[in-house]
């Protein structure tokens, strides 16, 4: 475990409050909550982590209570990762953020709320669990979708969120780009044409991954959902006879990022509990909670326990293949970038 694991003398009850609630950060004077009987914590997260943190908040509350004697109430806020980052940067109060990718945390850093070096605060570049991108198709796979070529062919209805607001959508896009890059040996004109054809098949761009799942699962739209692996497995768990997962030949290692919001925790006096909240995500107990919720545990030994669930031999590129998030964002998703160039609104 990393050296920031602080066993503190204060604490928490297993009450987790969910929804998109949070209070605007007002910057009142610094205080210390370590001697309070109860402390509150707000975790601003991305769209499909509701179930994960519903489970995690319960075990963390128990852990904190045992370690410190203090009760903790954790409030959750969920939405598209990019949108959530913007909300925090603009004043939505968060003690911690657990977002879909490093770039979104950097946006909060750039607003002056998170200190430089946050990515090194916890193990694995502050990514306690990972995921990847898969296809969710209807039972029997009626459109015979096996790889990215099939997603881009005529007559296929695709559901994916908007990469302008959703972290998962950016992972989706980059996974498709990686496939096309391999297929066309780096010929960017052909790669862009492939991505354009794929997005011409998109029926609706929801703002976040959970909204896209709702469009596909509950509203019956589309033939294939480009999805976080965990979101696809949850859909099958809830509807076991209606959907199948297809693993593409090339996908991407999706690394959600976690960080303490320094400006907020120092004002609220919650740094100790906030730091432990994120640090405990690396505990064996929490790593199994991640696996049970279909995220790939960072701990390789615990990941092996889920070898019957996850394809551990999947061909994955990483964000480093795109020059890191700053470069990927600038080239593909910033205003005037490639996505704006190729996507035509219906």
Place the predicted regions along the sequence by residue.
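A conserved helix-loop-strand patch within extracytoplasmic ligand-binding domains
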Residues: 109-182
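Ligand-binding pocket segment of bilobal, Venus flytrap-like solute-binding proteins
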Residues: 184-249
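Early extracytoplasmic/lumenal segment of secretory-pathway proteins
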Residues: 28-111, 121-122, 228
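Residues embedded in well-ordered beta-strands
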Residues: 134-136, 244, 257-259
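Short, low-complexity disordered leader/linker segments with a strong preference
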Residues: 1-40
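Alpha-to-beta junction loops
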Residues: 91-97, 155-156, 218-227
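Extracellular/periplasmic juxtamembrane helices and adjacent flexible linkers that interface
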Residues: 265-346
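Solvent-exposed loop/turn segments at secondary-structure junctions
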Residues: 48-51, 81-84, 102-106, 140-143, ...
């Amino acid at each position: 475990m990393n050296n920031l694991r602080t066993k503190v003398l204060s604490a928490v009850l297993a009450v987790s409050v969910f929804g998109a609630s949070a209070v605007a950060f007002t910057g009142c004077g610094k205080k210390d909550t370590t001697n309070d009987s109860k402390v509150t914590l707000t975790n601003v997260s991305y769209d499909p982590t509701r179930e994960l943190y519903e489970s995690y908040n319960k075990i963390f509350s128990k852990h904190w209570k045992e370690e410190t004697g203090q009760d903790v109430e954790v409030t959750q806020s969920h939405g598209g990762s990019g949108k959530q980052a913007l909300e925090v940067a603009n004043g939505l109060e968060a003690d911690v953020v657990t977002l879909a990718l490093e770039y979104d945390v950097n946006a909060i850093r750039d607003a002056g709320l998170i200190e430089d070096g946050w990515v090194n605060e916890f193990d694995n570049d502050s990514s306690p669990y990972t995921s990847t991108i898969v296809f969710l198709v209807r039972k029997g796979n009626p459109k015979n979708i096996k790889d990215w070529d099939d997603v881009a062919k005529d007559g296929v209805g695709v559901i994916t969120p908007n990469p302008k607001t959703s972290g998962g959508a950016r992972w989706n896009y980059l996974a498709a780009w990686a496939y096309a890059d391999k297929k066309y040996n780096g010929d960017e004109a052909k790669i862009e044409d492939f991505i354009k054809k794929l997005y011409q098949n998109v029926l609706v761009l929801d703002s976040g991954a959970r909204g896209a799942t709702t469009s596909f699962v509950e509203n019956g739209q589309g033939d294939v959902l480009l999805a976080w692996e965990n979101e696809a497995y949850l859909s099958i768990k809830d509807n076991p006879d209606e959907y199948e997962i297809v693993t593409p030949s090339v996908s991407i290692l999706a690394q959600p990022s976690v960080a303490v919001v320094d400006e907020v925790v120092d004002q609220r006096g919650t740094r100790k509990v906030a730091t432990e909240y994120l640090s405990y995500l690396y505990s064996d107990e929490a790593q199994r909670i991640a696996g049970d919720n279909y995220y790939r545990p960072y701990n390789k030994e615990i990941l092996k326990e889920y070898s019957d669930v996850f394809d551990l031999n999947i061909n994955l590129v990483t964000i480093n293949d795109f020059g890191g998030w700053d470069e990927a964002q600038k080239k593909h998703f910033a205003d005037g970038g490639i996505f704006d160039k190729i996507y035509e609104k219906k």
